[in-house]
């Protein structure tokens, strides 16, 4: 089997000092105009506060592709707080280059799950999806990465993703961000 046109990927690693991220200053000027189709508390964070945590991870990821971090910048990051019943609708960040999510809590069985969705799955008949799923021993429609507190995911911004309904009484908190080209 030859694989052509690989375009869906994500980078999964862990950052240290994740507890420090819980107490970052909130940017009160952050204008959230995109959260109408979901149920999540969104608060802007300051870029400079996140750079020490995010840039080393992004730099290591880009180095694998012989790409320099100096051609990119971290855009306005934000904190997501999910209460019981909260969710994030399926979406992408199509105007950016890379997107990411940092998980601030250990998972609970009733926590909402971050997931990736293959937007191209609908282009194939069910037998074709099954064939691809079996050949590559991986899901073809959606994928839920296994994450724990301190994990960070980096993925292309065009990759569809969301968060399933949060059913726990405990809050679920993440930090999201985009990386754009200069």
Question: What residue ranges belong to the model's regions?
Answer:
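A structural signal for short, well-ordered beta-strand segments
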Residues: 77-79, 100-102, 175-179
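Catalytic core of non-heme Fe(II) oxygenases with the double-stranded beta-helix
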Residues: 83-154
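Catalytic core of Fe(II)/2-oxoglutarate
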Residues: 135-182
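Histidine-centered active-site/metal-ligand motif
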Residues: 78, 91-93, 161
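Non-heme Fe(II)/2-oxoglutarate
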Residues: 1-70, 78, 85-87, 113
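A generic structural micro-feature
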Residues: 69-71, 92-96, 167-171
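Intrinsic-disorder/low-complexity, polar/charged segments enriched in Ser/Thr/Lys/Arg/Asp/Glu/Gln
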Residues: 8-10, 97-99, 142, 172-174
């Amino acid at each position: 089997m030859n694989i052509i046109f690989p375009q869906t990927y994500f980078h999964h690693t862990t950052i240290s000092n994740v507890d420090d991220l819980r107490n970052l200053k909130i940017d009160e000027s952050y204008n959230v105009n995109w959260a109408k189709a979901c149920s999540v508390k969104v608060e802007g964070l300051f870029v400079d506060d996140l750079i020490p945590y995010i840039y080393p991870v992004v730099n290591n990821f880009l180095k694998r592709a012989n790409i320099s971090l100096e051609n990119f910048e971290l855009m306005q990051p934000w904190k997501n707080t999910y209460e019981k019943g909260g969710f994030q609708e399926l979406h992408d960040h199509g105007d950016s280059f890379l997107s990411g999510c940092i998980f601030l809590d250990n998972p609970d069985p009733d926590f909402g799950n971050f997931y990736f969705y293959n937007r191209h799955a609908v282009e194939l008949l069910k037998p074709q999806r099954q064939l691809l799923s079996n050949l590559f021993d991986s899901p073809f429609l959606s994928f839920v990465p296994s994450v724990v507190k301190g994990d960070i995911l980096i993925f292309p911004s065009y990759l569809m993703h969301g968060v399933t309904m949060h059913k726990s009484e405990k809050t679920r908190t993440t930090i999201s961000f985009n990386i754009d080209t200069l």
